[in-house]
Structures are given as C-alpha cells and as structure tokens.
Amino acid sequence: MKRIFIIYIFLLLLGQISVSAQDINRLRERDSNYGNNSIADRNYDTMERDSTEQEEIDASSIPIELHMWNVDERLGTRSPAPVDTIYHLFQNSNLTDGYNGEYNYLGNLGSPRESRIFFNRPSHTQFMFTDPYSAFIIPPEKIMFTNTKSPFTNLTYHKAGSKRDGEDRFKAYFSVNVNKKLGIGFSFDYLYGRGLYASQSTAFFNSSFFGSYVSDHYDLHAIFSFNRLKMAENGGITDDRYITNPLDMEANSKKTPQPSDILTNLSNTWNENKGFYFFLTHHYNLGFERDKDMEAKKKDEKEFIPVTSFIHTLRVDKNERKFISYDKSADIYVHNYFQQDSVKDITKTLSIKNTLAISIREGFSSWAKAGLTGFITHEFRSFTLPDTIPGNRT
C-alpha cells in the first residue's frame, strides 16, 4: 500500500507540473500581445498585482481533445481506437477469467489462464512461460498512443478480500503532447494477490514507456516495456477428497477445512518471469500535395496524399524464467536431473526481429482502389537452457 500511495502522489505532481507548464506558455503567448512588454520587463508589485495576473484560468478554457490509436506489430499500421468513457463492465476489467468469464484459471488474481474459446486464443510466442499471463502482459499492438491538447491521466485501483487473502491491483496511465506531432507517456501496473489457497500468491509488476511522432512525411512509434512476474507454486492438492468428498476430510480433521487448510504437494516453490521488449516502427512517406477542398479550390488549404511508404519495424525481446524449489523433489518428479534437496531451473531467451516493407497506399488516385504491401522479415533467436551436468548451460 505504501508503494501505491507514493506512486499516486508522484503522478499527481507530474500532472500538476505539466499543467503549470502549459499555463506558463499561455501567459507568454498572452504577454507577447503587448509587444516588448514581456514578463521580465513588467513591474509587478507583491501586494497589488496586475489585473491580468489575477485572472484565474477557468476549467472550461482548458482545451479538451483526445485521440488514441494503436499500431500493428508487423508493419506499424495505425488503427484508431475510440476513447471509452463508459463505466459499463468496469468492475469486470480486473477479472482474470475475462469480461465474460470465458477463461479457465487457477482461482487467484493474476494466475495462469487459458481461453475456453479456441479461436480466441492468441498465437504462442517463442517464450512459452509467459503465454498464460495474457491478463497482465501487454503486447505492442495493445499499447495505446495518444494525441492530446492537455495532459491525460487515468488511475484505477481494485481491491477485494481481507489482509490475509485479499487482492490488490493499481494501474496508472499518463500521456502528454510536447507539440502537435510529438507525444510521450508511460503506464504502470502493480498486482498483488495473496490467494485463498496455500502457496498461490502472485506479485506482478509492469512499467511501459512509449512515444510517437506523426507528420505527413514521417512517423515513428517506440515502446519499452518491462515485466516482472513472481508466483508461488503448490503443485496441486495432496488428496482429491478435499474437493470430491469434503465431509470425509472434515471428519478426519474434526473441523470444517478452510481453503487455506488444504494440503498441497509444494509449499516452498515459486517461479519468476522477468524480461523486457523494445518495439520500434517508423514510416517514410512519399506523395504529393493537392487542394484540400477540391470544389472550392482554396489554394491556401493543402493536404498531403501519401503514395508510397518505406517501413522498418524492430522488436527486441529478452526474457528469463527461474523455477526455484526447496521442497524435497525425490517424491514429486519422476525424473530428477538436479539435486535432491532443491531445484534451480533457469531458462533465458533473446529475440531480435527486423522487418522491411514497401507499401503502395490505397486511395491516392481514383484508380487506386486497393493498396499493395511487400515485406521481408529476419529474426535472430537465442535460447539458454540448463544442462544435466551441474554448472553447465546449453
């Protein structure tokens, strides 16, 4: 809770600084109307301030205009995303089993999940250990870029349960435009689920930074996202009668067993997935200008019509997965290639993917009813796995 409170205060201060900077720009623009009578040249009195200085910025005068979009991972094609300001189903946005309960999962916030609808399952990545955590990890195509006239902040906090078995999740999103073409922002996500059952807790952290530059001839989008996911493993329950016939277990224990009382195969085992990805896509457009209003023929209003685009996309992924166990493994695993008293399984992967493309744009002429894009992709992959010989890695 202390971390969440500190982050919340930081975001409030950051938003206040951004608003203050825009207020100073407005004052400079206003004072420029007085010619050489700039802010530094004017004689201000600490007690009797100028009447213009006493003007308070009305909330209605703050410009409100927000555009959001995301980009395709392969070619960086922009897709507009209408801003959703409706509270409908907001309470379901934090559920691991999805908005409509279409996912199977292990019962705790952030635990691995799999969609029961086969056609809705995303494609598997090269690092299979993070695929079941689709509720938390944000791929590049789901990062929202913005173009806004005033700083935009979105904070959400979900809480359920008690201090013993409760769940907490705090998310923050902030974006601001430097000018009409350049925008930057970041997102933050912290999840902590204690869980109703033994050895089931989750602690996830994500931080993403993104920026965009969009103009007629050139546009660029960049993302850096870091993830750290730590989850306890229980290996399942020791006796199925806890579920199939709980009355027998109640008779044996002489009390009604609680979820946290159910014995599990593992009690001192966990896994940790840590990694980051860097995504960059940029386009250079060739085209021509024509009158924006073809009927009125207003020569002073021109619009750029792209004809051909040269595209480059880069994605770098680096991930590491640790499986640590201090439970006695001799009675659990059929084949044990590690020490009998502990397990330390570390897997690493590195992927560098480049895509080059040339695109003939749709609609630049009356006969260009469709576009055409050709691309070539090269990907480098490296995997590091533990060897059966202690101390060696392959």
Report each predicted region and the residues it spans.
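Sec-dependent signal peptide cleavage junction
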Residues: 17-89, 291-301
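Outer-membrane beta-barrel translocator/channel fold
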Residues: 102-105, 195-204, 210-276
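Short strand-turn segments of transmembrane beta-barrel domains in outer membranes
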Residues: 126-131, 139-174, 195-196
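Outer-membrane beta-barrel channels and translocator barrels
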Residues: 148, 179, 214-218, 287-289, ...
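Membrane-embedded beta-strand positions of outer-membrane beta-barrel proteins
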Residues: 155, 186, 211, 220-222, ...
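Transmembrane beta-strands of outer-membrane beta-barrel pores
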Residues: 157-161, 190-194, 215, 226-230, ...
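Surface-exposed extracellular loop regions of Gram-negative outer-membrane beta-barrel proteins
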Residues: 168-210, 367-383, 394
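Face-selective signature of the C-terminal outer-membrane beta-barrel domain
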Residues: 259-333, 337-394
